[in-house]
């Protein structure tokens, strides 16, 4: 589960965050303001301060928030002076926007608020449609509304060029005041409530937020244009309501609820992608007529409410199609407020003790949860409080009166906090609503069965009883000074919350050592907080919009024992997971050594049994080799035997019946090259390849009845294959990694003659073994650093283990295996044809494609009939329209064309007789493997420097470049063998979003933008990891590049049509090269290694028995004089999607090459 934070505000207006992986409340970095309430999203938090103004807190990130400003310079040609700024009266402005309708001079473009800053001055954009323009960046046309070209023609009467300038948001990790317009008529009233949500509205662009606010006069306001590149938004717009609103809540999706002064609830209807503000309000009556609704909180599919009598209610039947729900259900507990966060998890603040409670047991099937559980963690400042007094406090608690005098010397007391308060200024009374329920704090964490369990240790009970008996009933300052006060009494001291009393600056007469310790700095600066070290924080507001808690996950928020102060809690001894792992490893190592000692003395004895044989049998299904191909029931037997030399080998027998005749098929497992699960939504099947089966493109396919049976057979057969080839443990640093279209990860150990120039090993004989996990892209280098990217753009780093997934037990390492999840989308298309009577309908011609189909139209795919890719995936969303398809869409998601096989566009013309719309649905997979998440930036591409085997990389870090899912180019710092995840990202500025990046062995960095243009980064070195500037490289004629891969000296690129290109003319003095040369077509992915070896994934490869899509291929004949090679060697195939050979720097040893030459020359051709 990724780390996220819970936001909360205490009664003194201080904002805290609590991490899902932490155990302490951390005070917000910017503590200059006091807040009433906050509303959090993943990337930011909005809040209302004590001045009733709205503030925004944007969390820091390695990727800056940048916005590009554009202005166009327009000129017209005249016979006297050529092109000039003197235009016709009917022309556009000399300086305008892209449409020409808005006057936009360079000096008239200002920053929207003080929270922005300019990155640089204005400069000309010399990129036009992916191609570099001439010097000056001018583009030409016959007239301004016409189509522009890079080349000047005889009829080019006008020209224009684009000026760009970037501004950067600078107010991060601080509260920035949202600016308001100066016009009093447009200035909204002071706010008293706000809510942030809407980031998961169906079909909405990623990064857009809906910010709703309520003013003191009961008006509802909506903040326009709030998004990731514009976190502040642009302006406030008034939303009409049927009454005065007191509070509003916006869920992550399209649920928006508000409460009225009269106690009813308002529900916003018609919220969608094109209308995030909705259309109208619907009224929902409160649960009872006596007590109206005073607070409401909306989630994805739930709504929680609190009535005026503090009762908690759950709204049943709420969803996007019925946002009003059906009925109210009363829940247990009394709260002042509740908040629904991500995954419909719920938090609340209790009326009795002002503690934050978490609703446990909330799942998609039980949205109301089961019980409330108090979050009992302390604050960050409490660590030093408890640490400075834990030893003496333990002595005073467990050894009686003998050390209580000395224990008091270092124990923090309320006097110290009072002294700090007096030095700060006048006393600060608590809010009135906290006075009624907060006089006694000792029962707040131990009352009720829904809070954390009470302790029952005799020593703790004795200490608690003794502290109760000796606690004097005096004022707060008197307690701290009294000689009978002990550290054990601090948690149960009565605190007068109504009027905190001042105390003199003079230290207590009986405790001279306390003042001395305090002057030495043993007490932290957190002592000026309004709470004592062991006081229970009093909360006023909580927001879980940025807290992602998955159902069934384990949190550390409830591990502190209730009824004990943080100081006493430090006494409990616990064994951390790291200590447990070290302890287990030590015992395992000792047992292994003892076993070796016991066996060494008996190795000279003859074995009683010369060889052992064991057999495993079972029932499976086999995809038969003959026509008609179908699944047939078979019996399988795996026979494993141990030879005289101790080596193990195995044979797999498949027994089947043909025309009542029993036959069998056998496979030697030492000949098997790969065992791969097959993507099938109906069968638990896997394929078995041998070199002969690889050349035929016809593997042995077997299917099990259940997923567990398939995993058992797959793990057993894989283990047997590894034992036959003596392949065990983690892959070597030079291993070759690959990923299938299913997301399965495979690795192969390269032999020395794999990249030999003569008598090289055919790549169809390479052995591939599966690693646990699920990825879409993988990248490795020869120093053992391996990174991967999932389908949801999450970055993962290899931990050094092996196995995971279905390979548990003997086929998996005992450590470095972690849970991994991935999310991908399934797409189907809705097709319609136009007719003159009814317009576009789902009735097509008999020759048309299915009205609900896949992207090709050849396979019928309906919403009800479409299933996840395999049985391991589960749906996590409903069907929604995908607006991000190539070619663009209209507001409803439709694409138009003259006929179905033609090209589609996002607007309707007179010749468009068909249209289609893409629907998507997300599904999720949970597995395990040797991978750890690299948060928080999501990536679309990654590249690691391919180092040669003789390169010494001990003096510098591993160079790693990546492209985020938003198109930002990043450089990872601090990557090494010991720290493969690195430390931080360094942003590399670009003028447009990028799609692919690759770094070569000599630090040459090439990249491809989303418009298909190529770029080279200059001056990249270990001392200057980000380089200095980009050089625009012309793309191949009429082609748009999609991927680039750089080796030691070679640069290869791939275009959108599957053509592979080689960059010729690259020299050390001219690293940009001179031209592109075509190498091959039918290529899906390319990977160039440190030896300039070229490996690709081919789209289609025809075998003797079948056709495989997605095949691993190696370029033959690559050498310095022939860098493009001469042909292809076809390897494993049928479903492969990505490969990385950038770690394979293994060369043939020189003595081996000389031995081959000594054997004799090859065949001579006359």
UniProtKB/Swiss-Prot annotation:
Name the record gives this protein = Tectonin beta-propeller repeat-containing protein 1
Organism of this sequence: Mus musculus (Mouse)
Q: Got any disulfides in this one, which pairs?
A: none
A single Gene Ontology biological process assigned to it is: autophagy
Positions carrying Phosphoserine are: 386, 388, 391, 413, 418, 943
In what residue span(s) does the PH domain sit?
616-722
Please name the InterPro entries in this protein's record.
Answer: Beta-propeller_rpt_TECPR, Peroxin/Ferlin, PH-like_dom_sf, TECPR1-like_DysF, Tectonin_beta-propeller
Q: Where is this region: Disordered?
A: 404-496
Q: What function does the entry list?
A: Tethering factor involved in autophagy. Involved in autophagosome maturation by promoting the autophagosome fusion with lysosomes: acts by associating with both the ATG5-ATG12 conjugate and phosphatidylinositol-3-phosphate (PtdIns(3)P) present at the surface of autophagosomes. Also involved in selective autophagy against bacterial pathogens, by being required for phagophore/preautophagosomal structure biogenesis and maturation.
Gene3D superfamilies, A to Z: Pleckstrin-homology domain (PH domain)/Phosphotyrosine-binding domain (PTB)
Q: Which GO terms describe its molecular function?
A: phosphatidylinositol-3-phosphate binding
List the record's Gene Ontology CC terms alphabetically.
autophagosome membrane; cytoplasmic vesicle; lysosomal membrane; nucleoplasm; protein-containing complex
Polar residues bias spans:
407-416, 451-462
* Cell location: Cytoplasmic vesicle, Autophagosome membrane; Lysosome membrane
| This protein's UniProt keywords | Autophagy, Cytoplasmic vesicle, Lipid-binding, Lysosome, Membrane, Phosphoprotein, Repeat
């Amino acid at each position: 589960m990724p780390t996220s934070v819970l936001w909360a505000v205490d009664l003194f207006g201080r904002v805290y965050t609590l991490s899902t992986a932490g155990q302490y409340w951390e005070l917000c970095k910017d503590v200059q303001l006091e807040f009433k309430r906050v509303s959090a999203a993943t990337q930011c938090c909005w809040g209302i301060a004590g001045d009733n103004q709205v503030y925004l807190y944007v969390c820091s990130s390695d990727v800056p928030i940048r916005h590009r400003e554009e202005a166009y310079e327009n000129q017209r040609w005249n016979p006297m002076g050529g092109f000039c700024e003197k235009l016709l009266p009917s022309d556009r402005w000399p300086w305008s926007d892209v449409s020409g309708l808005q006057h936009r001079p360079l000096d008239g473009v200002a920053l929207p608020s003080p929270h922005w800053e300019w990155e640089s001055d204005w400069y000309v954009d010399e990129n036009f449609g992916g191609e570099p323009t001439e010097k000056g960046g001018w583009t030409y046309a016959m007239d301004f509304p016409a189509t522009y070209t890079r080349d000047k023609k005889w009829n080019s009467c006008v020209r224009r060029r684009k000026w760009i300038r970037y501004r950067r948001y600078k107010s991060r990790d601080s509260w920035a005041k949202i600016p308001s317009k100066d016009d009093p008529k447009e200035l909204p009233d002071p706010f008293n409530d706000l809510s942030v949500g809407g980031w998961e509205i169906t079909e909405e662009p990623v990064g857009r937020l809906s910010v709703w606010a309520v003013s003191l006069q009961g008006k509802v306001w909506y903040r326009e244009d709030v998004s990731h590149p514009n976190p502040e938004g642009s302006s406030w717009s008034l939303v009409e309501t049927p009454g005065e609103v007191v509070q509003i809540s916006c869920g992550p999706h399209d649920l928006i609820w508000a409460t009225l002064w009269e106690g009813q609830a308002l529900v916003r209807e018609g919220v969608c992608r094109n209308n995030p503000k909705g259309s109208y309000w619907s009224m929902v009556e409160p649960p009872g007529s006596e007590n109206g609704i005073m607070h409401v909180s909306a989630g994805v599919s739930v709504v929680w409410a609190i009535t005026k009598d503090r009762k908690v209610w759950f709204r049943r039947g709420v969803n996007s199609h019925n946002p009003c729900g059906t009925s109210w259900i009363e829940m247990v507990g009394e709260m002042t407020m509740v908040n629904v966060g991500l995954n419909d998890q719920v938090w609340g603040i209790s009326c009795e003790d002002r503690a934050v409670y978490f609703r446990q047991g909330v799942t998609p099937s039980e949205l109301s949860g089961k019980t409330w559980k108090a979050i009992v963690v302390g604050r960050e400042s409490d660590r030093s409080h408890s640490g400075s007094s834990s030893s003496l406090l333990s002595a005073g608690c467990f050894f009686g009166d003998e050390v209580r005098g000395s224990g008091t010397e270092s124990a923090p007391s309320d006097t110290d906090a009072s002294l700090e308060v007096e030095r700060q200024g006048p006393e600060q009374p608590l809010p009135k609503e906290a006075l009624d329920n907060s006089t006694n704090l000792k029962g707040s964490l131990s009352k009720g069965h829904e809070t954390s369990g009470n302790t029952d240790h005799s020593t703790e009970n004795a200490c608690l009883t003794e502290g109760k008996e000796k606690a004097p009933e005096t004022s707060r300052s008197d307690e701290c000074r009294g000689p009978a006060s002990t550290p054990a009494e601090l948690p149960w001291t009565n605190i007068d919350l109504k009027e905190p009393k001042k105390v003199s600056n003079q230290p207590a007469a009986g405790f001279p050592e306390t003042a001395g310790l305090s002057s030495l700095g043993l007490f932290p600066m957190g002592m000026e907080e309004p709470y004592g070290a062991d006081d229970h924080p009093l909360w006023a507001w909580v927001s879980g919009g940025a807290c992602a808690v998955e159902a069934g996950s384990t949190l550390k928020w409830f591990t502190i024992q209730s009824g004990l102060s943080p100081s006493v809690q430090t006494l409990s001894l616990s064994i951390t997971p790291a200590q447990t792992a070290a302890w287990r490893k030590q015992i395992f190592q000792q047992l292994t050594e003892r076993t070796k000692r016991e066996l060494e003395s008996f190795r000279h004895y003859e074995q009683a049994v010369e060889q052992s044989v064991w057999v495993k049998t079972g029932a499976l299904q086999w995809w038969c080799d003959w026509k008609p191909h179908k699944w047939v029931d078979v019996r399988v037997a795996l026979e494993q035997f141990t030879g005289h030399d101790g080596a193990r080998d195995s044979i797999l027998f498949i027994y089947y019946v043909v025309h009542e005749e029993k036959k069998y098929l056998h496979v030697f497992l030492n000949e098997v090259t790969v065992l791969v699960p097959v993507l099938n939504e109906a069968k638990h099947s896997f394929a078995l390849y041998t070199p002969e089966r690889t050349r035929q493109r016809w593997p042995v396919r077997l299917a099990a009845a259940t997923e567990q049976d398939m995993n058992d057979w797959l793990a057993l057969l894989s283990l047997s294959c590894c034992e036959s080839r003596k392949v065990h443990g983690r892959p070597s640093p030079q291993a070759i990694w690959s990923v299938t279209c299913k997301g399965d990860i495979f690795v192969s150990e390269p032999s020395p003659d794999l990249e030999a120039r003569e008598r090289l090993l055919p790549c169809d004989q390479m052995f591939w073994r599966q690693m646990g996990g699920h990825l879409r892209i993988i990248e490795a280098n020869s120093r053992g650093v391996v990174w991967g990217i999932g389908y949801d753009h999450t970055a993962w780093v290899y931990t050094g283990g092996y196995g995971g997934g279905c390979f548990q037990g003997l086929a998996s390492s005992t450590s470095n295996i972690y849970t991994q999840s991935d999310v991908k989308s399934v797409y189907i298309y809705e097709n319609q044809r136009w007719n003159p009577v009814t317009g576009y309908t789902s009735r097509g011609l008999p020759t048309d494609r299915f009205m609900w189909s896949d992207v090709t139209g050849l396979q019928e795919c309906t919403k009800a009939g479409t299933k996840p890719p395999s049985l391991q995936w589960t749906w996590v969303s409903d069907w929604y329209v995908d607006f991000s398809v190539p070619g663009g869409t209209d507001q409803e998601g439709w694409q138009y064309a003259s006929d179905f096989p033609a090209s589609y566009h996002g607007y309707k013309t007179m010749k468009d007789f068909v249209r289609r719309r893409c629907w998507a649905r997300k599904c999720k997979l949970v597995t395990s493997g040797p991978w750890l998440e690299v948060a928080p930036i999501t990536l679309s591409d990654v590249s690691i420097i391919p180092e040669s085997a003789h390169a010494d990389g001990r003096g510098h870090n591993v160079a790693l470049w990546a492209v985020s899912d938003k198109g930002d180019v990043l450089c990872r710092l601090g990557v090494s063998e010991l720290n493969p995840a690195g430390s931080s990202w360094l942003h590399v500025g670009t003028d447009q979003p990028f799609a692919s990046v690759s770094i070569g062995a000599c630090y040459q960095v090439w990249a491809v933008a989303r418009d298909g243009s190529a770029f080279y980064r200059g001056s990249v070195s270990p001392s200057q990891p980000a380089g200095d500037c980009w050089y625009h490289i012309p793309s191949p004629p009429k082609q748009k590049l999609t991927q680039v891969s750089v080796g030691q000296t070679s640069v290869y690129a791939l275009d959108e049509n599957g053509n592979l290109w080689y960059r010729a003319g690259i020299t050390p003095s001219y690293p940009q090269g001179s031209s592109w040369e075509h190498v091959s077509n039918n290529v899906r992915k390319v990977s160039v290694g440190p030896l300039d070896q070229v490996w690709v994934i081919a789209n289609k490869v025809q075998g003797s028995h079948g056709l495989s899509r997605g095949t691993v291929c190696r370029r033959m004949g690559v050498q310095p004089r022939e860098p493009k090679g001469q042909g292809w060697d076809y390897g494993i195939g049928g479903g492969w999607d990505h490969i990385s050979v950038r770690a394979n720097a293994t060369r043939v040893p020189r003595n081996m090459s000389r031995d081959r030459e000594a054997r004799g020359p090859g065949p001579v051709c006359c």
